[in-house]
């Protein structure tokens, strides 16, 4: 009787490439176990290489494949004379060969499995062939009563065998009406809505330029816009918002982020975009700007970045800027030469920049913060990557 092909499980058809035909190969594995107790173990033959064998066993009464366990109480050879050796032996088999994996363990006084060892692959057995472990367990550890492995002088071995049987191929054709769910295009669709200025209901005027937008989207994305339109403010009544402190190109980039969650030109305007993100409470955009500024910190700009971070409560960026200054200062004190990322002269260079000198006059509290942090800093290894900023 021929096997009727069955389709792949539904869970495997929901994603990825789709083929017109398919095949499943099922490798059949028969698993069974065997327990062997050796009474009066201490009276077993004490000569190296001598063998004690179990009775034969199989997976069931109708299985003609017979196995047994083989123990060398005092090891198999000189290399293993201080160990107990344990092997699985194929006694008889109707096939020319068979592949099997196995696992051995001991049962302690509480009948718990312990000292387990298992094969890392399926070994090839032929009749009369054995596989196992020459150094299964040290004899001194086994004979130590404190370890509880020989209660009443009984050694109990537990063996689990997994025998590879035949392989079965199941093949068939895919249904022609199989559904493929398209990828989500929400970001692209909203981006097209913004770019096309379709169905807009408000206008935003920035630097003499008009940007048409959708109040519902602005309100959903920005708590500041939400407050404008929710309460009966002038902007809500006239559907007009005048913005005077953001440059048009920066505002456009912010709007692209509001609609799509992306800011393709962020690297070019991270400082101004951070200010806009802070003003309109766009937390994720703000942290993305912080990350970009952290990655571009230098001797020339660190003071300006520190002022910017303080002005807009960008705490992660502020901490990274102070850390940059302090690393340079500590390296200079330690007399370090040029390293992979740091130069001992950077600290002096920072203090010579126009940004640092301006900060002393306009933001002296930031200078004080930097030196307080330096005073409490621990001397840890330098040159490590900065921590990635947490994004909201």
Curated annotation (Swiss-Prot):
- What assembly does the database describe for this protein? Homodimer. Heterodimer with SPOP. Component of cullin-RING-based BCR (BTB-CUL3-RBX1) E3 ubiquitin-protein ligase complexes containing homodimeric SPOPL or the heterodimer formed by SPOP and SPOPL.
PROSITE patterns, A to Z: BTB, MATH
**Descriptive protein name:** Speckle-type POZ protein-like B
By sequence similarity, the record places it as follows: Belongs to the Tdpoz family.
Q: From the UniProt record, report the name of the gene that encodes this protein.
A: spoplb
Instruction: Name the pathway it acts in.
Output: Protein modification; protein ubiquitination
CDD domains to which the protein is assigned, alphabetical? BACK_SPOPL, BTB_POZ_SPOPL
So which domain of life are we looking at? Eukaryota
Organism from which the protein derives: Danio rerio
Q: Which cysteines are joined by disulfide bonds?
A: none
Functionally, this protein is described as follows: Component of a cullin-RING-based BCR (BTB-CUL3-RBX1) E3 ubiquitin-protein ligase complex that mediates the ubiquitination and subsequent proteasomal degradation of target proteins, but with relatively low efficiency.
Q: Which GO terms describe its biological process?
A: negative regulation of protein ubiquitination; proteasome-mediated ubiquitin-dependent protein catabolic process; protein ubiquitination; regulation of proteolysis
* UniProt keyword annotation of Nucleus present: yes
Q: Name one Pfam family in it.
A: MATH_2
Question: What sequence ranges are listed for the domain BTB?
Answer: 200-267
The record's InterPro entries line, in alphabetical order, gives: BTB/POZ_dom, MATH/TRAF_dom, SKP1/BTB/POZ_sf, TRAF-like
Recorded GO molecular functions are: ubiquitin protein ligase binding
- Output a single Gene Ontology CC term carried by this record: nucleus
Major localization class: nucleus
What subcellular locations does the record give? Nucleus
**Alphabetized UniProt keyword annotations:** Nucleus, Ubl conjugation pathway
Which Gene3D superfamilies does this UniProt record tie to the protein?
A: 6.10.250.3030, 6.20.250.50, Apoptosis, Tumor Necrosis Factor Receptor Associated Protein 2, Chain A, Potassium Channel Kv1.1, Chain A
Q: Which residues are in the MATH domain?
A: 31-161
